[in-house]
């Protein structure tokens, strides 16, 4: 497939570009800044510029079979709040609607479990129930989570209007190597550090594999899919964590051992995807 990857210079974007090239796809990479030279070997073409520019967005999607939209500020602290929201939402709107108009058949919208509204909330909300499913209501108050929630609405709208298959992948904390080790060390020192993220995680390389799988699976319409590792970041059992940090949350299904409190069935069934990287049995590298 001919695939546009937006935000190609980001932490996930770089992994996605390399993964797609390894899987035989032809990659056009976009970012608002110059990309590292190390990405050149994986790309057929590079587009540099701001996706909020409608003409640039139209140019970026032209001739593509699929779009992977990973461009976004990655947290509410990455810029001023107004800039985080307007950049993330407008860039999603520009590139996804341009893809729809251009007849692009497959859209992978890189979303986040922040679209639930838990991860960055200052009021420390708890999920209504676990395992948290994709239809859990939005409970957020931060601009980043709101921007990802709205981005999923944009993807669904584009799918309905132009008939494209659009998949919003909800990722948790992503990391590998030193980034993952640092995150784990903070959680192990104090499990409350990851309370808002419900101790979910995924190796960045597995996230890229999930994106690649999404491009070729037989899907239709728009669907949001949670993609996480099967276990948590914590050393304490999941039920103990929930009782300590989310005592009002209803536990609707068994969560033995360190099982992640997110429903992952949709990802396994629709994407035929299972993470291969783990931190409990191997060194986090």
Role assignments for model-derived ranges:
Residues 44-87:
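NAD(P)H-binding glycine-rich loop region in Rossmannoid oxidoreductase-like domains
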Residues 174-192, 197-224:
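Alpha-helical substrate-binding/gating segment
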Residues 111, 152-177:
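Conserved beta-loop-beta element that borders a ligand/cofactor-binding pocket
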């Amino acid at each position: 497939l001919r695939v546009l990857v937006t935000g190609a210079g980001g932490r996930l974007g770089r992994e996605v570009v390399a993964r797609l090239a390894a899987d035989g796809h032809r990659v056009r990479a976009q970012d608002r800044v110059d990309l590292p030279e190390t990405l050149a070997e994986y790309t057929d073409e590079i587009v540099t510029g701001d996706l909020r520019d409608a003409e640039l967005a139209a140019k970026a999607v032209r001739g593509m079979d699929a779009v992977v939209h990973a461009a976004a500020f990655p947290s509410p602290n990455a810029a001023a709040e107004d800039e985080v929201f307007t950049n993330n939402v407008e860039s999603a709107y520009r590139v996804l609607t341009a893809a729809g108009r251009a007849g692009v058949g497959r859209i992978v919208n890189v979303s986040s479990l922040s679209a639930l509204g838990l991860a960055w909330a200052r009021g420390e909300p708890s999920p209504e129930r676990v395992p948290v499913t994709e239809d859990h209501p939005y409970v957020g108050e931060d601009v980043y989570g709101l921007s990802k929630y709205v981005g999923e609405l944009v993807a669904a709208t584009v799918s309905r209007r132009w008939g494209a298959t659009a998949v919003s992948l909800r990722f948790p904390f992503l990391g590998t190597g030193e980034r993952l080790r640092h995150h784990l060390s903070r959680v192990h020192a104090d499990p409350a550090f990851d309370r808002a993220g419900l101790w979910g995680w995924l190796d960045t390389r597995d996230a890229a594999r999930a994106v690649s799988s999404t491009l070729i699976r037989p899907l239709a319409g728009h669907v949001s899919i949670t993609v996480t590792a099967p276990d948590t970041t914590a050393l304490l059992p999941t039920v103990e964590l929930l009782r300590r940090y989310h005592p009002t949350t209803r536990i609707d299904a068994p969560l033995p051992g360190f099982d992640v409190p997110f429903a992952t069935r949709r990802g396994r069934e629709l994407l035929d995807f299972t993470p291969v990287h783990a931190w409990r049995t191997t060194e986090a590298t």
